[in-house]
């Protein structure tokens, strides 16, 4: 059927979305009134949305449905819970056994179908809601720190060496030039033997 109005289809209701009422997320268009968490129906925006495949969630419901399972996960400090989210209508699915991929570019393939990459620091899965990209890899926000001093980094303030990331200060101290006049500040020469 031709799309005479020229608008895109909403990712939730599949009706035409016109420019004045459009919200875009991960290449999909939504009506402002349809841009709601699929579980709790809370209004979403660019800072609160978490995407899994074609589905949109608030970060809380996303964490309950797809985050780590077990005592103490996703609740904040000092709480333990066995709530698996059934009260919110979340049904847990058994995951099928692992099948090795035959795709030579598995990470890009996994991104397109909603899979996840592994954080180089902790080796855990990195989901879109917690992803930071630096040195060509995906990291958890909490793991995106200098390997030497632990200082939080941004993609513009890091230096990488051998797959590890450092703040510019630690990188300069550990891997920068050494010898006469280096690393002492303006006007100072030091002779070390």
UniProtKB/Swiss-Prot annotation:
Keyword Repressor among UniProt keywords: no
All copies of domain LIM zinc-binding, residue ranges: 10-61, 119-170
Species of provenance: Pongo abelii
Protein name (database record): Cysteine and glycine-rich protein 1
Residues bearing the modification N6-acetyllysine: 84, 112, 131, 137, 161
GO molecular function: actinin binding; metal ion binding; structural constituent of muscle
Subcellular location: Nucleus
InterPro entries noted in UniProt: Znf_LIM
Cross-link Glycyl lysine isopeptide (Lys-Gly) (interchain with G-Cter in SUMO2): residue positions: 91
Function statement: Could play a role in neuronal development.
Domain of life: Eukaryota
UniProt-listed SMART domains: LIM
Modified residues (Phosphoserine): 81, 192
Motif (Nuclear localization signal): 64-69
Keyword terms of this UniProt record: Acetylation, Isopeptide bond, LIM domain, Metal-binding, Nucleus, Phosphoprotein, Repeat, Ubl conjugation, Zinc
Subunit structure: Interacts with ASCC1; ASCC2 and TRIP4.
Example GO biological process: muscle tissue development
